[in-house]
Amino acid sequence: CINLREVKLPKSLYTICEETFYGCESLESITLPDVVNIGESAFAHCISLKNIVIPESVEFGIDDSAFLNCTSLQKVTVNGNIQQIGSAVFMNCENLKSINIPKSVESIGNDVFEFCDNVTIKCYENSYAHEYAKTNGINYSLIFDEREFGDINNDGKVDVNDVTHLQRY
């Protein structure tokens, strides 16, 4: 698939299997449907791929080496309920600058960001991704949950209970 530049996959697709787009050197853009898993090396060596959005439907995870050596990849947005990011998923994505990782991630494999010297992980405080970034010396930026200004008791609304709670202090 040397000349493949763009792919729009059908909504009926359930999973992206192992090595599906392996080595598609000209692939710049892909729209992922509501798949539940991205297989091992599914996009490995897609050296022209610049951005990827992992849909909310991906629950199980991103398997090992899924985006290995995608050297033009700059930004990854991971949405939803993903549970695991396999080993070496973004290894040698040397231009990767930003990836957001949701709270739902419970496991991140070895060498995921090896040779990604400029990456910043956007993560939630005290999440698995936050601890992973700190432990592995990876730059990170914290994402804060949106709260309404004045919501002292964090129940999602501003009311008299917030005033009562504030008066205690």
Feature locations, PLM:
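Alpha-helical segments with a strong preference for the paired helices of cellulosomal dockerin domains
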Residues: 152-169
